[in-house]
Amino acid sequence: MLADVAAASTEVAASSARLVKIERIATLLARSAAEDDTQAVAVIVSWLSGELPQRQIGVGWAALRTLPPPAATPSLTVDDVDDRLSTIKAVAGKGSQATRAGLVHELFSAATDPEQKFLRHLLSGELRQGALAGVMADAVAKAAGLPAAEIRRAAMLAGNLPAVAAAAVTGGRAALADFRLRVGRPVGPMLAQTATSVDDALQRLGGTAVLEAKLDGARVQIHRSGCDVSIYTRSLDDVTHRLPEVVEATLALPATELIADAEAIALRPDGRPHLFQVTAARFGRKDPGDLGPLSVFFFDLLHVDGRDLLDLPTEERFGALDALVRQDQRVDRLVTTDTVAAQEFLERTLAAGHEGVMAKSPHAAYEAGRRGAGWLKVKPVHTLDLVVLAVEWGSGRRQGKLSNIHLGARDPDSSGFVMLGKTFKGMTDAMLEWQTQRFLELADGPTDGYVVHLRPEQVVEIAFDGVQRSSRYPAGMALRFVRVLRYRDDKSPAEADTVETVRRFYERD
């Protein structure tokens, strides 16, 4: 029942103890397995991970702002809600927005108050309860009675923990045999931790690192079997039909079968990268014909002609890649033990218009779907002093705290502020306590709604990775990957950074 999931979500969010979270989720999964409901197991894992199996269903916060009166008693099952969400996603054509709104109203009319709260947080992307991938994998293992390492390995190779959970909890160890590296089935990409500098990276990697240019493009995973090529994004969406140049480049390689990591990027005639949005536009179009070409640069090889390379060290995988792909189609690379040489490589990469560098251990295996210690990213940190324009009430562990802040830059022309994004990243518990009290004092209107609007008086220093084009905000720009560093009580709003300062970052990016 949906009521059971909502109750479990509340309990998981209320606890900071990892073992308590694992036990509560495992109990819920085991109950669904006992009812032989494989679909429900997969859906529950998705939901409690804060995700929808349908990914996006075309329902924004506006449709969730005003809800119908809740039902008195629970009646919705997990499968019923999942089917309804699939129906909402499938709505298209003229009048689709109104149709979706009607279907959302019907769904919420059938939900009790706790169920409505759960669904609203889930659909708005605000279900933050501390049930991260590691916790969820351990909960699946406990429910299935299997070692967590087996669940993680299967999820790594499947790129899909919900599917692994459904198989393991209902079918046991034998059901995991199907989850192996397979051409045509994407795996979760290996992710990088962050290093503060190339010197920090070298030290953490034991003194020797393989440095790579970190291109500001779109990461893709490429699968080839004979003449068939499939291309997936880092979130495992199939974008093959949107990237014909990548298909062509892959078919030109001297291999029959392969799985490779690569970066697709739009380059200017002089070889410098276009703005990230130019590359990203290709991933949002069904017909790429009216947009510029993309280049592809390979940087890792997971499988080639019947041979799995996942568990091999970096240097061996790169050796296999070098034997397969021409140098001008590979990401620039330097193996070094020298901090000066590493810093020069970083500076050359930045001067060429790229994001920074990746530093990789020559001995690390490919940890698919994990943020491994063998990969470190080094990028310059940009900071801005902005003004908090509004703030949202939190959920889960942040229930009762003002959490997600709306950020604005100063606009000298209008003597006001222009919104550039939102963030709840980087906030400590002490900071949440402080800002809740502070922002209630600055409230400019009611404080019982989801969003509390503020008098623009509080300056905050934030770090960000870049600026991208956005139609969501009046300035046409949005900050990327924003984190709070500290509140600047020593600065007045008149000292906040201007829209023009942000625009210079945008033009440079």
From Swiss-Prot:
The keyword Transcription regulation does not apply. The keyword Transmembrane does not apply. It comes from the Bacteria. The active site is at K214. CDD domains: Adenylation_DNA_ligase_Arch_LigB (cd07901), OBF_DNA_ligase_Arch_LigB (cd07972). It catalyses: ATP + (deoxyribonucleotide)n-3'-hydroxyl + 5'-phospho-(deoxyribonucleotide)m = (deoxyribonucleotide)n+m + AMP + diphosphate. It holds the Pfam family DNA_ligase_A_M. GO terms for biological process: cell division; DNA biosynthetic process; DNA recombination; DNA repair; DNA replication. ATP binds at E212, R219, R234, E263, F299, R371, K377. Gene3D superfamilies: DNA ligase, ATP-dependent, N-terminal domain (1.10.3260.10), DNA ligase/mRNA capping enzyme (3.30.470.30), Nucleic acid-binding proteins (2.40.50.140). One of its GO terms (molecular function) is DNA binding. InterPro entries: ATP-dep_DNA_ligase, DNA_ligae_ATP-dep_bac/arc, DNA_ligase_ATP-dep, DNA_ligase_ATP-dep_C, DNA_ligase_ATP-dep_cent, DNA_ligase_ATP-dep_CS, DNA_ligase_ATP-dep_N, DNA_ligase_N_sf. Keywords: ATP-binding, Cell cycle, Cell division, DNA damage, DNA recombination, DNA repair, DNA replication, Ligase, Magnesium, Metal-binding, Nucleotide-binding. Its EC number is 6.5.1.1. Disruption phenotype: Not essential for growth, no effect on NHEJ. In quadruple ligB-ligC1-ligC2-ligD deletions NHEJ on blunt and 5'-overhangs is 0.22 and 0.12% of wild-type respectively; only 4-fold decrease in 3'-overhang NHEJ. Its cofactor is Mg(2+). HAMAP family: DNA_ligase (MF_00407). Belongs to the ATP-dependent DNA ligase family. DNA ligase that seals nicks in double-stranded DNA during DNA replication, DNA recombination and DNA repair. NCBIfam families: dnl1, PRK03180.1. This is DNA ligase B. It comes from Mycolicibacterium smegmatis (strain ATCC 700084 / mc(2)155) (Mycobacterium smegmatis).
